[in-house]
Amino acid sequence: MQPIQLFELASRQAEWLSARQEIVAGNIANADTPKYRAKDVTPFNAVLDQTHIGMARTHAGHIRDMSSRQNVDVVDAKLDQEIGIQESGNTVGLAEELSKSGEIKRQYELNTQLIKSFHRMMLMTVKK
């Protein structure tokens, strides 16, 4: 039997969500700073690719190998056409950053709910 990697995967995602929330909070804090450039982190898929955590392939037709490796970095956020560069010269859009913050919250809640459910299933299995 192969080890269950769900807990490690969830832990990695929680770390990534924490880092992203920190960057988004920094963007919000600097919304009025002249010439401040909004930042974001690389997508979680890139982080997942780097950690070499994946699902076990038990049959050749089940999972395709996605071998794109990227660095996890803080990068300048893409300019939204609506926001663009403001008079102060910065690229922070409060509505967009608050939306990102809400998305991070939902992803974190989903992450913790999945772990709780999986933990309950494991406990039920052990008790029987």
Which functions belong to the PLM regions below?
Residues 1-128:
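Amphipathic alpha-helical polymerization modules
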